[in-house]
């Protein structure tokens, strides 16, 4: 049965050749050049405003092609596994955070929780969340290249009735997340939080995570930043 399944998969690949989800290059699900973006890009950070406060927000890329197309495929393709790419994006950001000195300045945290942005109940039900892979990569890099112990804690949830952000304006995105997240576990004293999202556009999701974990918040991080 396994042989037949593998043979059928190979036959589909021959009959319907794939193209790179990032740039469209023929006969590659993800071409080497696009795959290399996860480690080749240099993460940057800026201060993100959140009401009367602000915090560091790390980003790996602008939300433009080919990164945009890769992220869209990761979120919506049921046939393509991009978890390794997402993990390496997290590693890249985590290395930059660890090497920046940010963790030894302005925070008393001796350990970190890396908290992925909450997926909708539908994505959680079908295992379609992608930020968890980025969080795992970031935690591995920070924990391996700093004196701070680091682990992934999936402890942020959306209220179940909250709708998708797709098709909403910036203001609608902010309003749809405001007040609709909660932590499933209290963050212990001496533990800092880094929040992870795939894309930050209006900042609604990341700022709501900041509200939930404000007392413990160290920084936010994302694969891509949309400035439209």
Labelled PLM ranges:
Residues 1-228:
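Glycine-rich phosphate/pyrophosphate-handling loop used in enzymes and phosphotransfer proteins
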């Amino acid at each position: 049965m396994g042989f037949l399944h593998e043979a059928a998969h190979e036959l589909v690949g021959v009959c319907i050749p794939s193209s790179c989800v990032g740039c469209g290059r023929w006969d590659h699900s993800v071409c080497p050049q696009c795959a290399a973006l996860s480690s080749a890009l240099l993460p940057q950070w800026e201060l993100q405003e959140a009401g009367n406060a602000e915090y560091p927000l790390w980003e790996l890329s602008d939300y433009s092609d080919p990164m945009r197309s890769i992220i869209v495929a990761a979120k919506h393709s049921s046939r393509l596994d991009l978890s390794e790419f997402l993990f390496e994006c997290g590693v890249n950001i985590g290395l930059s955070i660890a090497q920046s000195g940010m963790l030894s300045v302005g925070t008393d945290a001796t350990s970190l929780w890396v908290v992925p942005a909450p997926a909708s109940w539908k994505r959680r039900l079908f295992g379609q969340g992608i930020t968890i892979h980025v969080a795992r990569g970031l935690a591995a890099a920070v924990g391996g290249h700093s004196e701070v112990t680091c682990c992934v804690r999936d402890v942020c949830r959306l209220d179940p009735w909250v709708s998708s952000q797709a098709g909403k304006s910036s203001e609608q995105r902010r309003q749809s997340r405001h007040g609709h997240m909660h932590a499933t576990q209290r963050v212990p004293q001496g533990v800092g939080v880094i929040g992870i999202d795939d894309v930050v556009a209006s900042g609604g999701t990341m700022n709501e995570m900041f509200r939930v974990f404000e007392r413990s918040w160290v920084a936010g991080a994302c694969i891509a930043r949309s400035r439209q």
